Each structure stands twice: as structure tokens, then as C-alpha cells.
Design a protein with these regions (language model features):
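Conserved small-residue
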Residues: 5-97
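Transmembrane beta-strands of outer-membrane beta-barrel pores
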Residues: 6, 20-26, 111-113, 122-126, ...
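Residues that define the transmembrane beta-barrel architecture of outer-membrane proteins
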Residues: 12, 99-103, 187-192, 211, ...
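C-terminal beta-signal and terminal closure region of outer-membrane beta-barrel proteins
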Residues: 38-70, 151-163, 176-178, 218-250
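Extracytoplasmic gating/loop element in the C-terminal half of outer-membrane beta-barrel translocons
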Residues: 123-214, 219
């Protein structure tokens, strides 16, 4: 945690702040006691329980992308051989959802009753499994094809021989298995909060029997930059709020 005052006088105060966090978590002394859960979860999620592993590890079969000639996905076995056949026995750790570094940095400013502050939240490193791509670009049922879908399901899927696409041919309606193709680096910078304010202690307030007048305005998450393009606000409503306050002290 860092808090540093760049300028400090009777009328002016300018400071900066920075905090950061890094965490590493590993399993110990599990042995084979959770092997039954590892086997059961292979087609359900990316979490496995092994000694020395992390609860944030993302397990999947490695993918070499979509074959331009056939529109089928090419997988890698544990030995590094290419194959069209997906086998969960070939899964390895393909990422970790825990960031390498995350925290908040910002600055605050005061000058003769005026105040302003801005804070940014950052996340560097780590990966994410793209559920939007997995469930709404591929793995779309025939009936769902007639409904509104992510536009990438139309524009980014394989369409013709030689087409270098990110997603398999839409004609292949079999279920897409979990692979590293849906794991992406997850770096984020968010404008977490911004606020401005003013406080006046002028003698003119005494006419009203008041000692001070304050005004404040606040906005949260005023922008967001991310290395992934994913849906937000599906499971929990996403909100960007703006608030104002006016106070009179007697």
C-alpha cells in the first residue's frame, strides 16, 4: 500500500495512492481421495483437485484451433500429437484464473474548498474461461439458431475451405467439448470511481444561520477496458451509478 503527498500547502493538497495484491494458492496432501470428483468434473468444469495444483487452475485439452480445410477443431494430445478426437485424458493446466497482480491506484486533489478524486482498478495476468463463446457462439441448439444470438456465431464461424476461423463450422451440431480454445488472457482496467466536491464556509451563510455548504458528485465504473469480449450483467445486474448531494450545516 502506498499513499504519497506530492504537494502539501495550506491551500493545496495533492496525493496519490496505490495498492496491489498477489496471491498463490496450492493444494496439499490430497492424494487420490478426490479422484472420483476429478473424473466426474471432466465434462462439466475446469476445476481439478491434485496435490500441488491450484484451486484456480483451468484444466482443459489443448487446442490448435480450427482446421481451415474442414472446419473441425484440432486438439493436442499430452504427447503433443495433433488429432481431431477430443479425449479428456489429454487435459492439462491451460491457465489460472487468479491474476498475477491486482489492486487500485488513484489520486486526490484539494484546493481552497474544491476536492476531486479518481480511482482505477486494475487486473494483470490470469486467464478466464469464455462461457459466452462456449455457450452462445458454439454449442447452440438447432432451435436456438432461430433466436437472437451473439453476432460472432454468424460472422466468426468457419464457412468455406481455406477459411481461417476462430470457431468451428456451424453445420457441426455435435456438442463442443471443453478445450483451451475458450481460455483467454484476462487483463482489465476499470475506472472505479470519480468524485468532485466543493465546501464553502463564507460569512454569507450566517444570514441563513448556516456554517457551511457542501456539494458532491460521484460516479462509479465510468469506463472499462478488457482484453476479453464477454457478456456482463447476465447473472447479476450490471449498474453504473451517478449520485449528487447537497448539504447545509447549521
Amino acid at each position: 500500500v502506498l499513499n504519497y503527498q506530492l504537494i502539501k500547502t495550506n491551500d493545496l493538497l495533492w496525493s496519490v495512492n496505490l495498492n496491489m495484491r498477489h496471491m498463490t494458492t496450492k493444494y496439499k496432501e490430497i492424494g487420490n481421495s478426490l479422484g472420483i470428483y476429478n473424473d466426474a468434473n471432466k465434462s462439466r468444469n475446469l476445476t481439478r483437485y491434485y496435490d500441488g495444483g491450484s484451486p484456480y487452475d483451468l484444466w482443459a485439452v489443448r487446442s490448435n484451433g480450427i482446421d481451415p480445410m474442414t472446419g473441425r477443431e484440432v486438439f493436442l494430445t499430452k504427447n503433443g500429437n495433433q488429432t481431431f478426437q477430443h479425449n479428456y485424458d489429454d487435459e492439462v493446466v491451460c491457465g489460472n484464473s487468479e491474476p498475477d497482480l491486482e489492486g487500485v491506484f488513484g489520486t486526490s486533489f484539494y484546493y481552497k474548498g474544491f476536492t476531486a478524486a479518481v480511482n482505477f482498478r486494475y487486473r494483470i495476468g490470469g486467464q478466464i474461461f469464455m462461457n459466452t463463446l462456449y455457450n452462445k457462439v458454439e454449442n447452440i441448439t438447432t432451435s436456438k439458431l432461430l433466436e437472437n444470438q451473439d453476432k460472432r456465431a454468424l460472422h466468426d464461424r468457419w464457412q468455406y475451405v481455406g477459411h481461417e476461423a476462430k470457431f468451428k463450422a456451424i453445420s457441426q451440431t455435435e456438442t463442443t467439448p471443453i478445450s483451451s480454445r475458450f481460455i483467454e488472457d484476462n487483463n482489465v482496467l476499470t475506472g472505479e470511481s470519480i468524485s468532485i466536491g466543493y465546501e464553502n464556509n463564507g460569512d454569507w451563510l450566517k444570514k441563513f444561520g448556516a456554517s457551511s455548504l457542501t456539494f458532491k458528485a460521484y460516479m462509479n465504473e465510468f469506463f472499462r477496458l478488457s482484453t476479453v469480449k464477454n457478456e456482463r450483467g447476465i447473472d447479476y445486474p450490471y449498474a453504473r451509478s451517478v449520485s449528487f448531494s447537497l448539504g447545509l450545516r447549521f
